[in-house]
């Protein structure tokens, strides 16, 4: 054991001195105080599985790779272990160890992961992944707090695989050294990261260097770095951070005047930055006077509403004649404190006293991010009448203001929310009558028509829809109004006229929601009706050959242009880095590189096409779809309907059946049409298993709280954590289960189930109660634009799948 340790130390020393030739066997790094045991064919520490007939080790590796891609770690462990146990091939065994190490790392079984990666690097040093094992060991050591060992592992990786992801690996190495208290080597690593052209966030690494310099006592260098970052950036948040960090250095140097000058500068200039609040706290603690207006702003944006209130009050008391901005923010502080009545009164005073203030129009209404009077009245105080009257008063007082038609439209929405449907319809009529040039006119007339349809006043509704149809200039608006003209004529018993309207609607855009629903009406087909059979017998090789030829002809490429490989892209540093990151399991970093490369080649149709195919082969569906879409855009196929004229290869990828080995069983288990679930998944994440928007995560965009709720109810997966949402197996399993619950709750109504999935079951229930059994009316009554568009978009996706995969007679 001692010999092994000495050998490791000697190799590491040679690497650090730059003396390791490319052909050297990869040195091993010990994961602990003892050499870990090797995984042997008789090892029983992992589960074994012997299917019949017995797959070959090569087939088991393929199965395991598919399983790890799907987040099915149990199957991956079994298959990798079986491949190792049943093969004498060094290549197979090395691949199995690499797979086992990755899975154990993913499930945070760090001890086993280190043992496995150690075995790979020591027993199979010529394997392509033996060097990568050192990077993963570095990640694991860092997670365990064994930072010196982490730094050494990164060092070996960089020495044996230089010039690939140096910027990233050097930064990780620097972080490990810094955490270990070795700031000198940390600075060296960080500087190496900065020197690499692949650096992603240069200021962040520069800050790390400066912080290490401070710890080493070199404050002069650190201050110089902060000043250079400040001078080079236009980002106010970064400028505030530099002011704060510089000021903190001056405090440690015993130069408080210099420090407070920096702190005052950030408070006065960058009120939105939280670092400005940290500077403010330092100033307050030191008793340094400052402008109360700026102090109040910093406090407000830091969420310190009580302190903000006091600062604004002092400013107002000291400056009774001012422009009113302090009064405006005073109202916002009341709102932040939950004193909604006081906030409304404060906005009242501001509105009456400061009509020339730039915040005057916003104060009348507001929104979720920056509330105002009407928003607070209806959303927090349930004063719908008063809120609507606030907005109507604004229109009366400022009829020429750019916000007037917007507020008039919103007043109608508030009246509708309050059940005053006749008033709402008349208010929406006013938008068209008083602001005929507004872009809001088509939707205002449409909403007026929907109100009259709900009231059973079909003749009046028909007039509103017809007027909307005449004034609409956007095809989608025209399809919307024509569809409802047909619905209204049908309600009036005018069947022939309704059929004519729907025929006209269907012809506008066969991929649009309203055109699709018109097609449904013409054949008496309910929304989301399943295909009797899904045809998945495509020939991707033949389809790609057709697409290759089409790309050559469409973009005037020479007949011998090779589109079968990535070509020169294989030498592109971004593609090389992205592929390496992906192999290491760093999908987010890989995505950054692939996205950047997609942007770089976006005007080159051949390279866009090559990149799309390459990314598809890696299972990077999200960026691949964007690359293929860009090819169609360059071919002047900007609309969805225009893409139908392209070779089917493009749309079979853009609307692919990805993750089908998980999705089909999950759909069958929960009683869903697989196309329906696939459409939801495409809408939610565009097949990006690491999608993260707001609080929602994964393929099915489940929030952590909802995920925990579903997992608790199902008792699956075992030991559930939020990170499991990024596993396709878990995301699809939980998502389909939750959708099934909503479908059951709403008696099989899929549109309402989707609304519940997106906006919550309580809101969906309210909308369904208002609409009754009419699904089309339900969609229009939905009060959240996001949810309404969500259902429409999913049905458009569903329509594409239906047209692409319907069985050909």
Which role fits each region the language model picked out?
Residues 70, 107, 144, 180, ...:
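Structural motif corresponding to the intra-repeat A-B loop/turn of tetratricopeptide repeats
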Residues 51, 84-93, 121-132, 157-168, ...:
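Short solvent-exposed coil/turn linkers within tandem alpha-helical repeat scaffolds
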Residues 65, 102, 139, 175, ...:
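Residue-level recognition of tetratricopeptide repeat
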Residues 55-82, 86, 106, 290-314, ...:
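Alpha-helical segment of the N-proximal tetratricopeptide repeat
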Residues 404-409, 418-423, 427-428, 434, ...:
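Catalytic glycan-binding domains that act on GlcNAc-containing polysaccharides
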Residues 19-63, 82:
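Ser/Thr-rich, Proline-interspersed low-complexity disordered segments
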